[in-house]
Amino acid sequence: MLQYCLLRRYRFLLRQHAQVIKRCYSGDIRNIGILAHIDAGKTTTTERMLFYAGKTRSLGEVHRGNTVTDYLAQERERGITICSSAVTFNWNGKRINLLDTPGHIDFTMEVEQSLYAVDGVIVVLDGTAGVEAQTVTVWTQADKHKLPRLVFVNKMDRPDANFEKCIVDLTEKLDAKPICTQYPTKSADGQLGIFDVITMEQMTWQQNDLGRNYSKVKLESSTELQEKRNELIDQLSGLDDELADVVISTESFDKVSNELIGQALRRATCQQKVVPVLLGSAYKNIGIQPLMDAVNAYLPMPEERNQMYDCFGNDFAGKVFKIVHDKQRGPLTLVRLLRGELKRGMRLLCSARGQAEVVSKIYEPLADEYREVGSMQAGDVAICAGLKSTVTGDLLTSSHTSLKNAQKRLLQSRGAAMPQDEDEVLDDASHELFSIEPKIPDAVYFCSIEPPSISSQTAMEQALKQLQREDPSLRVSYDSVTGQTVLGGMGELHMDIIKSRMLSEYKIDVDLGPLQIAYKETLGSSAITTLSVDKDIAGSKQSVSITLQLVSDQRELFSLDKSPENVQHLNALRPRILGVLRKGAVSALERGPRVGGQVVDTQIRLHNVTVGRGTADSFVMAAAAQCVQKLLITSGTRLLEPIMAIQIVAPNERISGIMADLSRRRALIRDVTSKGDRNKIILVNAPLAELSGYSSALRTISSGTASMTMQPCGFSEMNTADESLAVRRAQGLD
């Protein structure tokens, strides 16, 4: 009974302590990301925010190559965002930390990393296109992170913009519940204005002062706008009890104040029940100030997110979400500060590796410019210099004691009893709850990379190491057969950017070999074998006998045989031996026998193993790998080729030529829909192997009038003829 009372008292104190920590947070911070399909106007929107917030003195334009957030030479040259960039600015008493992310599928890893650091996002739609392919991808990523979001429908000044279609797309393609807080209107001369549904006002921007000022005119007599406001209140009252009570008590929508609507909309947005929709034209300087007002009003404060980290109390905790390399400052680590205070000269511990490092300097972010500060508080985003070993996904704490105490508090707050093997359970809790290791997508292409001279080999390896630390989706490996360094990447553009950055940033003019498709392999048939190995190594006898089976299975990678003759022996195996066997066996699946592709949808089943006394773990691991390699050759493998989902927008008169070309590329037409009166949208799946140089071919076929986007959508088995051709190409015989 005493123990129970003490536990109750401890949990009460823990809850009180958490409230104190929350009060230490600043409610005046908003950490947001901005997401979009390529060319929707995301970077232009960001540049306008910086300008109206007084952070920049002139408007940055993508086509002029003078943007703040697109600062890499490759970004300004191509007019696209490649690397996420962080900027900080103040707006109406709030401090906004904004991460501008890429829209191109080749750099989707940048988006994934950024979403670990934000509390909400703005999704920018092209008002002329609605929800596009990459919009779906970034929306799914935001769903995974359970992020509240706003939608900004951009380019609404254009004559072909369709606001209603965008709303339908949000509902049908993204399964969202949009709440329209604004509607478009146009003057007699075609200038875009905005109706504010909540305040019943019309907003009009002045073009002679770059959109700094705009006028508001009350429209209380507008029946149409009043109906829109009533519709908004009706939608919200069905989702928010507090607003519903007010509506019921007043028996009128007209008596619901703007403040009550805003509060209800904020609650529903933070709970991800609705998505407020705003509109404008970033390029024409329309609608940006209300968008920033909406960020302050509707997106959550830091204290409303990441509540799991309350267990750190006043101790420092932060998570690393990005690393960049600066020529003068060296590696710079972007850290989301979760709890406590970060100070210059502070000693930080990496929870994953137990390695301590010292923060030499702290900077406030503004893309590639930095303002040094002495300290920063929880809820903010900081750039740290001096952290040379930290990698993306690391949790940083002030000490080992702080980490252990936080893990104990978390377990106890959840009612978990402290087990006997405390360290093991705490390590599991650390991995499960405190790790943000991003899921790295599979490479789509790979190619060899060679330095211009032997003397440049070391410099090239160091440069690749730094680029890989910045970009986890860049794979770097060594082919022991050819002796070459091999790069794996997300697409042709990704590889081209790596080559360009090697030259511009590291002054190494590398040669890239021809791009190869990253095929996967799958099991041809089930097979079982026993491998026995006995060797004397440095006077020590090493022996192991292992029986493994390979079977087709998409669920489990490694399992134990359940047959009566083996189950007792296998259950008696030490966990360490099982771990070594698993690691060795699974490693052999990384390179299949046909083209060196990863072997997937295959289960390794352990039937029996005997390990001699004194046999080294490395010997057991090597034997397990050798046994699996032998089985793969015996059973044979089939190739799986990557399939791309393509969206093509083209004029009606060009469709027949495009369709004929697609049929020659083994493409599967999924859908063809109209876009206005003059264009059509073609949705198609096609093998990546058939799409080399397709963007150039499409420009030729359409005389430059068609546009396309594509992204990976899975793998598919190949027929015998195509598989044989792929093997010959991989072996350099065709």
UniProtKB/Swiss-Prot annotation:
- Which InterPro entries does the UniProt entry name for this protein? EF-G-like_DII, EFG2, EFG_II, EFG_III, EFG_III/V, EFG_V, EFG_V-like, G_TR_CS
Annotated localization: Mitochondrion
Name the GO cellular-component terms.
Answer: mitochondrion
Q: Start and end of every tr-type G domain? A: 27-303
Q: Looking at the keywords, is Hydrolase present?
A: no
Organelle transit peptide residues = 1-25
Highest rank taxon of the organism: Eukaryota
Q: Which CDD domains match?
A: EFG_III, EFG_mtEFG_C
Q: Where does the UniProt entry say this protein principally localizes? A: mitochondrion
Q: Name one GO molecular function term.
A: GTPase activity
Q: Where does GTP bind?
A: 36-43, 100-104, 154-157
- Which PROSITE patterns does this one have? G_TR_1, G_TR_2
> One of this protein's GO BP terms?
ribosome disassembly
Q: What HAMAP family is this protein classified in?
A: mEF_G_2
What family, per the record? Belongs to the TRAFAC class translation factor GTPase superfamily. Classic translation factor GTPase family. EF-G/EF-2 subfamily.
Q: What does this protein do?
A: Mitochondrial GTPase that mediates the disassembly of ribosomes from messenger RNA at the termination of mitochondrial protein biosynthesis. Not involved in the GTP-dependent ribosomal translocation step during translation elongation.
This protein is called what?
Ribosome-releasing factor 2, mitochondrial
The major lineage groups are: Eukaryota, Metazoa, Ecdysozoa, Arthropoda, Hexapoda
